[in-house]
């Protein structure tokens, strides 16, 4: 099985090294094409106004000055000697759950792989802070991901669907199970902090946070809060199908394919 790895935290990220160890428990044919620099929060963006510069580190490790989407395209269309059987994106430092999946470059790597017709999985590891220090229990994802991915590959999933895996903030031996979940909902809280530079001109820092909101029992949020691994199937079709009939009636048009 040929596996392509990417991420959004960059080629030097610890999570990418964890992902490679996970992948090597599944196959010896593992390739890495990851961003040269941190691309967190760039979602499914791709580079159109600048050239893509590819740096070969060794036979199967490449760094690209581009986004996770760029990396997947580069890997599939140029770097690999043939199409991959699986694309793994991650392991992200921090969970990618609920609405955050729309911002996530990690999830976007799996989205692009799915668009290219390759089975794709995004992996993220929740963490906590001790003072100013981020504590990421990488061993949780590294321990549980290989067997979970094997089972998922054996089960299979439809075209146009990617899998979003999130590992809880607990030790590997403290995980209480795996849940197949729905994408949750968090309260949106984005703020701008205006400051002044040395010449008095304004600039801004974006503070991105989440407020409290009701949590559904079947959601990805509830799963990782319960120290369970969350497996969320996401599909690329963004159509709000339940609303189509209502809009068709309101506009007096015939709903096709309903």
From Swiss-Prot:
Q: What is its main location?
A: cytoplasm
- Reaction catalysis annotation: a ribonucleoside 5'-phosphate + H2O = a ribonucleoside + phosphate
A Gene Ontology molecular function term for this protein is: metal ion binding
A GO cellular component entry from the record: cytoplasm
Q: What is its EC number?
A: 3.1.3.5
Out of the domains of life, which is the source? Bacteria
Q: Which InterPro entries match?
A: SurE, SurE-like_Pase/nucleotidase, SurE-like_sf
Presence of keyword Isomerase? no
- Carries keyword Membrane? no
Q: Where does a divalent metal cation bind?
A: 8-9, 40, 92
* Swiss-Prot/TrEMBL keywords: Cytoplasm, Hydrolase, Metal-binding, Nucleotide-binding
What does the UniProt cofactor note say? Binds 1 divalent metal cation per subunit.
The record ties this protein, via Gene3D superfamilies, to:
Survival protein SurE-like phosphatase/nucleotidase
What cofactor does this one take? a divalent metal cation
Compartment(s) where it occurs, according to its Swiss-Prot or TrEMBL record:
Cytoplasm
Q: What does this protein do?
A: Nucleotidase that shows phosphatase activity on nucleoside 5'-monophosphates.
The entry sums up its family as follows:
Belongs to the SurE nucleotidase family.
Q: What name does UniProt use for this protein? A: 5'-nucleotidase SurE
Q: What is the lineage of its organism?
A: Bacteria, Pseudomonadati, Pseudomonadota, Alphaproteobacteria, Hyphomicrobiales
């Amino acid at each position: 099985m040929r596996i392509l790895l990417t991420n959004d935290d960059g080629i030097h990220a610890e999570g990418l090294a964890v992902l490679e160890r996970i992948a090597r428990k599944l196959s010896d044919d593992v390739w890495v094409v990851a961003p040269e620099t941190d691309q967190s929060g760039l979602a499914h963006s791709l580079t159109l106004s600048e050239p893509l510069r590819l740096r070969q580190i060794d036979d199967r490790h490449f760094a690209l000055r581009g986004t996770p989407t760029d990396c997947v395209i580069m890997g599939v269309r140029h770097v690999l000697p043939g199409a991959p059987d699986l694309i793994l994106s991650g392991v992200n430092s921090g969970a990618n759950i609920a609405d955050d999946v729309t911002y996530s470059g990690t999830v976007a790597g799996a989205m692009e792989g799915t668009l290219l017709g390759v089975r794709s999985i995004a992996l993220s590891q929740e963490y906590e802070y001790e003072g100013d220090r981020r504590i990421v229990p990488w061993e949780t994802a590294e321990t549980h991901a290989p067997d979970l991915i094997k089972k998922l590959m054996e089960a299979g999933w439809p075209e146009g669907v990617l899998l979003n895996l999130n590992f809880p903030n607990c030790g590997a031996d403290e995980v209480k199970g795996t849940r197949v979940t729905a994408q949750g909902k968090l309260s949106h809280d984005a703020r701008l902090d205006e400051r002044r530079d040395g010449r008095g001109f304004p600039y801004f820092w974006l503070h991105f946070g989440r407020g409290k909101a009701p949590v559904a029992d079947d959601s990805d949020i509830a799963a990782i809060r319960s120290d369970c691994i969350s497996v969320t199937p996401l599909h690329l079709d963004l159509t709000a199908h339940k609303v189509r009939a209502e809009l068709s009636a309101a506009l007096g048009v015939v709903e096709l394919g309903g």
